[in-house]
Structures are given as structure tokens and as C-alpha cells.
A protein has these predicted regions:
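ABC ATPase "signature
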Residues: 80-81
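Single conserved hydrophobic/aromatic residue that forms the stacking wall/gate
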Residues: 1-6, 10
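C-terminal coupling/interaction segments
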Residues: 108-155
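Short loop immediately C-terminal to the Walker-B catalytic DE motif
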Residues: 26-27, 59
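Helix N-cap at the start of a conserved alpha-helix in ABC-type nucleotide-binding domains
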Residues: 31-33
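Catalytic Walker B motif of ABC-type/P-loop ATPase nucleotide-binding domains
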Residues: 20-24
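A short, proline-enriched helix->beta-strand linker immediately N-terminal to the Walker B motif
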Residues: 14-18
């Protein structure tokens, strides 16, 4: 298949490396080609001897391919965690200020206050959902987590 040929071509040119270091490898690619490249990278890491270190601003790609996420912002490492744990752990809570203050300390990481209430990044999303069944607590996407941690959405 053409996919197999492309994969063999990449391996031949790279001399069958154990580690690929990629900087913005999918930037500027159309969605079809980007998807094909991600599939090739996923095929590559099926061999447990192979690893990829990939920097990207396209967080959807990281959600699809990464096992671990390290987030650097202004030269500072803000977090490094297993991707699946990160996405299961955090939620985005939408509620009023009064509801927010009723949560135990440590669950609210960052809050953005607006005219219609608060939007907060919370730890232990499932616990928050049990404590506040009337509130909306969505699963956080990697974009959400990074925006809150960088302070862009926090107040």
C-alpha cells in the first residue's frame, strides 16, 4: 500500500531511528495530509523501541498521538503529565461565584470571572460533578488546560 511505502521511505531515510524529534511537524499541512502523517507516526511508535518527542501548537494532534504532555510557557515547565490522566483529571466548571466558593480547597485551579458567572479549571472532575450535580462541569480539553495554566484565562 502507499502508506506502507511512505513508512518504509521515512524509515529508510532516517536509518530506522529509535527516537524522532519533531518540531511543528504537522503545521501548515492540510487535514488529509496531517492525518496521514499522524497515522505514520502512530505506526512508528507501535514498536516499543520507538519514541517521538514532538513540539506542536496543534493540541488536537497531541491529544491524538501523545502519551505524555509537557507544557512549556515562556521558558517555564508548567506541567508534565500522562496525557490520559491529565484529560481525565481536569474539568471546566461553569457556575456562579456562590457555588464556586462551596467547593473544598484545592479543587479549583484557576478561575475566569465574567458577567454571567465563573468558568474554572478544576481538579478531580468526577468529584466536582458529584459535589455539584446542578452545575455543568465539562471534560477539559488540552487547549483549556493550557490556557488556564498559562494565565490567559485566569483572573
Amino acid at each position: 500500500t502507499s502508506r506502507r511505502q511512505r513508512q518504509m521511505c521515512i524509515r529508510d531515510r532516517a536509518h530506522d531511528p529509535e527516537l524522532l524529534i519533531l518540531d511543528e511537524a504537522t503545521a501548515g499541512l492540510d487535514p488529509v495530509v496531517r492525518g496521514e502523517l499522524l497515522d505514520l507516526l502512530l505506526d512508528f511508535i507501535q514498536d516499543e523501541r520507538h519514541s517521538i518527542v514532538m513540539s506542536s501548537h496543534i493540541t488536537a494532534d497531541l491529544e491524538q498521538i501523545a502519551d505524555s504532555i509537557a507544557y512549556l510557557h515562556n521558558g517555564q515547565l508548567l506541567f508534565q503529565e500522562n496525557k490520559d490522566d491529565l484529560l481525565q483529571e481536569y474539568g471546566v466548571l461553569h457556575c456562579g461565584e456562590d457555588v464556586l466558593t462551596s467547593l473544598p480547597a484545592g479543587l479549583v485551579v484557576f478561575t475566569r470571572r465574567g458577567a454571567y458567572g465563573c468558568e474554572s479549571l478544576v481538579r478531580e472532575r468526577r468529584t466536582v460533578q458529584e459535589l455539584l450535580p446542578e452545575a455543568v462541569c465539562d471534560a477539559a480539553r488540552l487547549d483549556d488546560i493550557m490556557r488556564f495554566f498559562s494565565g490567559r484565562d485566569a483572573q
